[in-house]
């Protein structure tokens, strides 16, 4: 997928999360708003704040059905409340999935099981739809059972680092199965697929092992800064693909998606920039105030030339002026974002053509949600299942997940 002619892959794309990690990433991707310097904005402000989020925008502007999928409990990171504030019509969490022996590891359903079983609901969503699937197997502490491993672990002596490659490979396989299904079901031909990593894989606490992986005696702050890169890919039919070297981060995803879908983001309160714009400044702020640009990098108080990794120990007056200018921009952006979040300032902004989300319009009660899903299918008749003469395409999804072998899972009705 990374090298597909229809995939734009960004190789200088960084996570920008703080303590909220996954929740901060969701806040940025759905709203182009930074998380907070401490805690999780989705937890502290997701319930009561007003947002102009991707689900609400796409539903109101383009008539999209909106749904999020996660194989864990709905209360984790306050999703069951924050998603209502974002305007998600559906939230398919752990209770929506059949109970299968050995189906869970770590933070929820194993990826291959989760991806396949999610299609039971995806095929019922009226098109067009905006669906977010959150996988968890390739997550710290990188636990994976032997029956799901197909490559050897690293041998650095650090258990966390050593098994990372195995869970990453498992995730890759699950995405491959998912894409095969999209091809078989016909969804691939009219879908924009975005794949992203929400936060760092291996923390800075594992420096000796990181050094071994990088083939170095020791790691520098520059190495650690570059270790904050995460995958970001956009795949769509007719999209002119390639490796894009633009510097950007999670805050930029929503404006980029809006550009691809023909939505102008100029009127929205968003802190990101369109990654496809020629006029973006390519300054990538980290939540702690550090930053990366194509020319310079600041990390843990040290400055580097980004292209070479050479440390700048005694900056010239010209370089220091540049550092100060970049730092002022980063500090200002983060400070303004904090004011927007802490003060719930979007509630004062009446955006023409956008109806503020009323959280009372949404429920994720399973019985009510499934009833609504059936009603929406009959009303719109645009779902994959409806277009297939109301026959399920679930069996078209092929997986080698050993847990599902000879299983016929029963979904809640």
Enumerate the predicted regions with their spans.
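Solvent-exposed soluble domains appended to multi-pass membrane proteins
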Residues: 1-413
């Amino acid at each position: 997928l990374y090298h597909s002619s229809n995939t734009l892959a960004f190789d200088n794309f960084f996570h920008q999360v703080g303590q909220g990690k996954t929740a901060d990433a969701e806040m940025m991707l759905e709203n182009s708003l930074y998380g907070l310097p401490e805690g999780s904005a989705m937890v502290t402000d997701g319930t009561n704040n007003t947002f102009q989020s991707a689900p609400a925008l796409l539903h109101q502007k383009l008539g999209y059905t909106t749904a999020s999928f996660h194989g864990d409990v709905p209360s984790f990171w306050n999703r069951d409340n924050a998603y209502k504030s974002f305007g998600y019509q559906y939230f398919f969490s752990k209770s929506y999935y059949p109970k299968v022996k050995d189906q869970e590891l770590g933070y929820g359903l194993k990826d291959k099981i989760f991806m396949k079983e999610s299609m039971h609901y995806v095929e019922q969503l009226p098109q067009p739809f905006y669906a977010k699937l959150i996988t968890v197997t390739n997550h710290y502490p990188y636990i994976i059972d032997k029956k799901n491993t197909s490559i050897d672990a690293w041998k650095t002596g650090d258990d966390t680092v050593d098994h990372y490659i195995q869970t990453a490979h498992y995730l890759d396989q699950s995405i491959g199965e998912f894409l095969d299904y999209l091809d078989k079901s016909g969804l691939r031909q009219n879908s924009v697929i975005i794949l992203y990593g929400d936060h760092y894989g291996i923390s800075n606490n594992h420096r000796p092992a990181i050094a071994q992986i990088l083939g170095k005696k020791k790691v520098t702050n520059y190495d650690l800064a570059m270790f904050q890169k995460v995958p970001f890919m956009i795949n769509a039919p007719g999209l002119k693909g390639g490796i894009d070297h633009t510097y950007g981060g999670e805050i930029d995803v929503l404006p980029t998606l809006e550009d691809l879908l023909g939505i102008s983001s100029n009127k929205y309160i968003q802190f990101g920039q369109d990654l496809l714009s020629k006029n973006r400044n390519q300054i990538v702020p980290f939540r702690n105030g550090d930053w990366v640009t194509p020319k310079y990098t600041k990390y843990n108080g040290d400055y580097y030339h980004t292209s070479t990794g050479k440390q700048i120990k005694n900056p010239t007056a010209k370089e220091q002026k540049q550092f100060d200018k970049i730092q002022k921009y980063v500090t200002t952006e983060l400070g303004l974002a904090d004011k927007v979040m802490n003060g719930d300032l979007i509630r004062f902004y009446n955006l023409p053509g956008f109806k503020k989300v009323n959280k009372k319009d949404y429920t994720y009660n399973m019985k009510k949600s499934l009833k609504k899903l059936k009603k929406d299918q009959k009303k719109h008749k645009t779902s994959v299942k409806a277009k297939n003469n109301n026959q399920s395409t679930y069996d078209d999804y092929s997986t080698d997940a050993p847990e599902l072998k000879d299983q016929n899972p029963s979904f809640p009705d």
